[in-house]
């Protein structure tokens, strides 16, 4: 009976770790054909965000320049002009295909991640007892650590998350999440998140040290500040 009580929360922890990957892969495969069919047959309006519109505009400007060049080079033989016109036509078709693939990719990733979060949320609510037991195990483990190890762990985590070199890590993380949801790169949004998110975390950490740790373990706060200095 005791082994069963230990095994169930441990199995729940493993399922939480691997369940998102399984949900993501399974739903992505099942939704891919449906999203592709819907976009190619039912979509009547062109869906563009600012980044996609800018890229398409740049491509069409290039094609327009080629067309003007086609009109200017009148001394070329007719066969050469025909080849140039065919090349512009093929490039336009390829551009439209790339646009459709980008839109399908964005819708597919966004819908898959949304379904994944909803399922994980329901799974966490149903497994509330297991989460409470896992939380008690973590608290017991942290309680048995010495104040020096606790202070070192807090200092290590804070330096990794909000230290001097953390903006590069946050930029990579936010870009990966941004792309995982299917959105196009937006340097302004990514830069604003990189510049503000670590500051918010630093403020929350200082407030937590001041309110919680200073009340629960003043010696830990003293050791932390000594190591930080």
Curated annotation (Swiss-Prot):
Its main location: plastid. GO terms for molecular function: antiporter activity; proton transmembrane transporter activity. GO terms for cellular component: chloroplast inner membrane. The chain crosses the membrane at residues 7-27, 106-126, 154-174, 189-209. The keyword Amino-acid biosynthesis does not apply. This is Potassium/proton antiporter CemA. It catalyses: K(+)(in) + H(+)(out) = K(+)(out) + H(+)(in). It is found in: Plastid, Chloroplast inner membrane. Contributes to K(+)/H(+) antiport activity by supporting proton efflux to control proton extrusion and homeostasis in chloroplasts in a light-dependent manner to modulate photosynthesis. Prevents excessive induction of non-photochemical quenching (NPQ) under continuous-light conditions. Indirectly promotes efficient inorganic carbon uptake into chloroplasts. HAMAP family: CemA_PxcA. The gene is cemA. Keywords: Antiport, Chloroplast, Hydrogen ion transport, Ion transport, Membrane, Plastid, Plastid inner membrane, Potassium, Potassium transport, Transmembrane, Transmembrane helix, Transport. It is a multi-pass membrane protein. GO terms for biological process: potassium ion transport. Belongs to the CemA family. Disulfide bonds: none annotated.
